[in-house]
Amino acid sequence: MVRGVRMLCPAWLLALAVLCAGGSEVRAQCWEDARCRDLTTDENILNCIQLCRSDLTDETPVYPGESHLQPPSELEQAEVLEPLSPAALAPAEQMDPESSPRHELKRSYSMEHFRWGKPVGRKRRPIKVYTNGVEEESAESLPAEMRRELATNEVNHPQEDSALIQQKKKDGSYKMKHFRWSSPPAGKRYGGFMKSWDERSQKPLLTLFKNVINKEHQKKDQ
């Protein structure tokens, strides 16, 4: 019997090591006991294993039992009731005034990392200030008939301006002188070789005829 127990000593030691490795707290409690410090005898080994097993079962909760019927602890109750506290349900106006500027600072800071910055509101037109103290009459103070006349004049003016521009274009030919590819003057067209008969100067031809007539007269005189 003793020989069989001695053969099982390595197995008991292995089981003891597994139980101790299950948790740091359990392992500390096991090794602090005097029975686990002296493992020279088989009786001490068995007692140490039973001690570690009992500590391990005490640490782990047993769900099949009636533990769910027990009232919760004060810490659990505080964690559950914290979101329902009056401080959490109070509106923002009743909160601490010191917390509101912090909230605004956080909000403004959160908008700074955007490229477009804070959202821009509707742009307002600048208010005209008259130094002479006389303000012009607004359109609202005018009667309905005068407002209609102003509206019709504003509508008709652009049409009249466009008609005048079209008439000017029809009267005068539009020349693209400011463009590089516009038509060059007649004197420089094709280098001056394609001039008409009227455009060319007739002086060389007249001098040629005069010379021929003078030579004929000289021959007749001789």
From Swiss-Prot:
GO MF annotations, alphabetized: neuropeptide hormone activity
A Pfam match: Op_neuropeptide
Post-translational note: Specific enzymatic cleavages at paired basic residues yield the different active peptides.
Main localization of the protein described in the UniProt heading: secreted
TM region positions: none
Any one annotated GO CC term: extracellular region
InterPro entries the UniProt entry points to: Mcrtin_ACTH_cent, Melanocortin_N, Opioid_neuropept, PMOC, POMC-derived_peptides
GO BP field: neuropeptide signaling pathway
Compartments it resides in: Secreted
Residue ranges listed under propeptide: 29-105
UniProt keywords, alphabetically: Cleavage on pair of basic residues, Endorphin, Hormone, Secreted, Signal
Signal peptide extent: 1-28
S-S bonds: none
UniProt keyword Secreted present: yes
Family membership: Belongs to the POMC family.
PANTHER family: PRO-OPIOMELANOCORTIN (PTHR11416:SF7)
Entry protein name: Pro-opiomelanocortin-2
Name of the encoding gene: pomcb
